[in-house]
């Protein structure tokens, strides 16, 4: 049946009775494809019926369906003509794992970060009304994303606007008992009936025109009605914001979903439809551990085991090191914004739960929460992906750095992350953090250096950012102690004529590039910078004065990066040397495997060597 579906129009040809069977085919397809490519499995398995119902009832792309975060869009992509591209999901030059406006007219709004859909939906609905057009605007948002402050701001604004916006709350974490669910479903059916709403309004009008008893009676009835609703309707919060609340609805009963969505099309004003789904539905391992299969690496379908499972990542190295430190130091606390597994803080959470804080999708709050802890003498470590730290930039400046509070930002997924693409590449953090006074920025060349930097940060009494990449870490010794002070780099290879200053994971690539250059008779210095701020100015100036060409290599955009910092230093100190800065260009970096992206942008070892060799030859006129 799935083979027949290449557009929403094809889906609408099916009988409703056929949709449950189609749902199962889709789940099998998703498990098979994601097991090979990796991707967001659990959330997509949980939203199959809801996606089918949305495309069955509404007319995309005339009606605008907006997916919050975008990672649960696989079924949407299949229905809208991209099923044949799923072998390339998240691969270099392949299908994006998120909604992307350049990929399809059905992807109304691009996403990757959470809590943005409601604001976008209100903007689109407002534009619709200003232009005098007629179509439906639907935003699909999960209960996790609803914890984001931006989503709550938008809910407040939508309710106040009274505009026709349909919000689908995909509630996939809590089961709702059957009696409450049945009662709520009954109330939803009643309240979605246009006849009921018309009668309700007529009764309200009638009560209001009987003075003075009418008004007081109306008030009394409203009090009774509100009291009853508080007892039996879980959506009172949304009602108070100005929404008509419908639900909860069984998110895996496609016929009920279609019925409610059809009724909702006829209603006016802001609507919130509460849909209950199960993450990972249909695949046993994902149902048991939806957190593990949220963003999954390739895996074995039969066993549920991931390819390469068992090796520690940089996140694990950080998490285990911090947990070991905290066992001996009661002032250390750990904070995550809904990413305990991804950031490696799960190790800390298990050992020291009373000093572990998961604040939900709330990076702004997490940062200022950390600042408050620091004011009272604690040492907070906020582990956050580089791309999500962007969301707390004002708090980093205003609440942490201006007050010079000793908060440590463990900046995970720094640099290129690969398959998640433009919205997740961590290639801006050096640039946006380097401009802020009072903060130290460091980046380890390997896992052992990460252990040392985490321990070094403990006794620094000002803000610190430690940036490290996604990926496996290699061997490391968690008992290591810091072997270098703040702001001190190291010379890894002595050389002549050319100096290569590298940061973080680009150090190993620079060493490999130096070996290639030796084959051309060139022996460059290779320096592990370790620190972006403060720079090891003494070492940089000493080496730069010995060479004809200075090269910087970083896993960050060139604009404002560590190469810019070194160029500024040399200029200020009147050391006039040509500086070749290698990093990412002034563009958003697409999705693909990390090594393919490094090669495309000239940051693999061979490309680094080739670029240096070419520039050196140009300088010599040969």
From Swiss-Prot:
Mg(2+) binds at residues 143, 172. The keyword Cytoplasm does not apply. Catalyzes the acyloin condensation reaction between C atoms 2 and 3 of pyruvate and glyceraldehyde 3-phosphate to yield 1-deoxy-D-xylulose-5-phosphate (DXP). GO terms for biological process: 1-deoxy-D-xylulose 5-phosphate biosynthetic process; isopentenyl diphosphate biosynthetic process, methylerythritol 4-phosphate pathway; terpenoid biosynthetic process; thiamine biosynthetic process. Signal peptide: none annotated. It is an enzyme of class 2 (transferase). Thiamine diphosphate binds at residues 71, 112-114, 144-145, 172, 283, 363. Homodimer. Its EC number is 2.2.1.7. Binds 1 Mg(2+) ion per subunit. Binds 1 thiamine pyrophosphate per subunit. Belongs to the transketolase family. DXPS subfamily. The gene is dxs. SUPFAM superfamilies: Thiamin diphosphate-binding fold (THDP-binding), TK C-terminal domain-like. This is 1-deoxy-D-xylulose-5-phosphate synthase. It catalyses: D-glyceraldehyde 3-phosphate + pyruvate + H(+) = 1-deoxy-D-xylulose 5-phosphate + CO2. Pathway: Metabolic intermediate biosynthesis; 1-deoxy-D-xylulose 5-phosphate biosynthesis; 1-deoxy-D-xylulose 5-phosphate from D-glyceraldehyde 3-phosphate and pyruvate: step 1/1. One of its GO terms (molecular function) is magnesium ion binding. Keywords: Isoprene biosynthesis, Magnesium, Metal-binding, Thiamine biosynthesis, Thiamine pyrophosphate, Transferase. GO terms for cellular component: cytosol. Its cofactor is Mg(2+); thiamine diphosphate.
């Amino acid at each position: 049946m799935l083979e027949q579906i290449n557009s929403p129009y094809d889906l609408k040809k099916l009988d409703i009775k056929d949709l449950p069977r189609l749902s199962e085919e889709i789940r099998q397809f998703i498990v098979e494809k994601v097991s090979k490519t990796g991707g967001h499995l659990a959330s997509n398995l949980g939203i199959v019926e809801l996606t089918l119902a949305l495309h069955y009832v509404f007319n995309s792309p005339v009606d605008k369906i907006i997916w919050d975060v975008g990672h649960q869009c696989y079924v949407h992509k299949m229905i809208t003509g991209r099923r044949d591209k799923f072998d390339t999901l998240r691969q270099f030059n392949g299908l994006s794992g998120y909604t992307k406006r350049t990929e399809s007219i059905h992807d109304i709004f691009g996403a990757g970060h959470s809590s943005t859909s409601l604001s976008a939906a209100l903007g689109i609905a407002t534009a619709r009304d200003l232009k005098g057009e007629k179509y439906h605007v639907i935003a699909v948002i999960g209960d996790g994303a609803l914890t984001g402050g931006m989503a709550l701001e938008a809910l407040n604004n939508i309710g106040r606007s009274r505009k026709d916006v349909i919000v689908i709350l995909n509630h996939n974490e809590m089961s709702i008992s059957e009696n409450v669910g049945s009662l709520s479903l009954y109330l939803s059916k009643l309240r979605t009936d246009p006849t009921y709403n018309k009668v309700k309004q007529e009764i309200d009008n009638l009560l209001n025109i009987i003075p003075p008893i009418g008004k007081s009676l109306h008030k009394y009835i409203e009090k009774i009605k509100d009291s009853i609703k508080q007892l039996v309707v879980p959506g009172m919060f949304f009602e108070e914001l100005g929404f008509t609340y419908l639900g909860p609805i069984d998110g895996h009963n496609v016929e009920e979903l279609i019925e409610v969505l059809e009724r909702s099309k006829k209603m006016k004003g802001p609507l919130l439809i509460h849909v209950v789904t199960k993450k990972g539905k249909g695949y046993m391992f994902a149902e048991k551990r939806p957190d593990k299969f949220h963003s999954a690496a390739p895996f074995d379908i039969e066993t549920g085991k991931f390819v390469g499972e068992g090796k520690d990542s940089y996140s694990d190295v950080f998490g285990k090191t911090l947990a070991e430190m905290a066992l001996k130091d009661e002032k250390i606390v750990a904070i995550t914004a809904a990413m305990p597994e991804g950031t490696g803080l799960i190790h800390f959470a298990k050992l020291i739960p009373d000093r572990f804080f998961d604040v939900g999708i709330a990076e702004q709050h997490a940062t200022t929460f950390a600042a408050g802890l620091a004011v009272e003498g604690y040492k907070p470590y906020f582990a956050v992906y580089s791309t999500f730290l962007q969301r707390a930039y004002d708090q980093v400046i205003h609440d942490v750095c201006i007050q010079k509070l000793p908060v440590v930002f463990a900046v995970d997924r720094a640099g290129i992350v690969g398959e998640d693409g433009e919205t997740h590449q961590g290639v801006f953090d050096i640039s946006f953090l380097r401009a802020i006074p009072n903060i130290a920025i460091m980046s380890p060349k390997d896992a052992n250096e990460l252990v040392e930097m985490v321990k070094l940060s403990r006794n620094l009494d000002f803000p610190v950012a430690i940036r490290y990449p996604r990926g496996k870490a290699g061997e490391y010794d968690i008992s290591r102690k810091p072997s270098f002070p703040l702001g001190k780099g190291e010379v890894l290879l002595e050389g002549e004529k050319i100096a290569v200053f590298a940061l973080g994971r680009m150090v190993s690539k620079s060493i490999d590039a130096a070996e290639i250059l030796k084959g051309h008779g060139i022996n460059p210095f290779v320096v592990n910078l370790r620190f972006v701020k403060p720079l090891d100015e003494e070492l940089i100036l000493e080496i730069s004065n010995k060479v004809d060409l200075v090269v910087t290599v970083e896993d960050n955009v060139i604009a404002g990066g560590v190469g810019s910092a070194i160029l500024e230093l040399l200029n200020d100190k009147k050391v006039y040397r040509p500086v070749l800065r290698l990093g990412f260009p002034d563009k958003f970096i697409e999705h693909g495997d990390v090594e393919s992206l490094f090669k495309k942008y000239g940051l693999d070892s061979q490309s680094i060597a080739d670029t240096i060799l070419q520039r050196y030859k140009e300088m010599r006129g040969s």
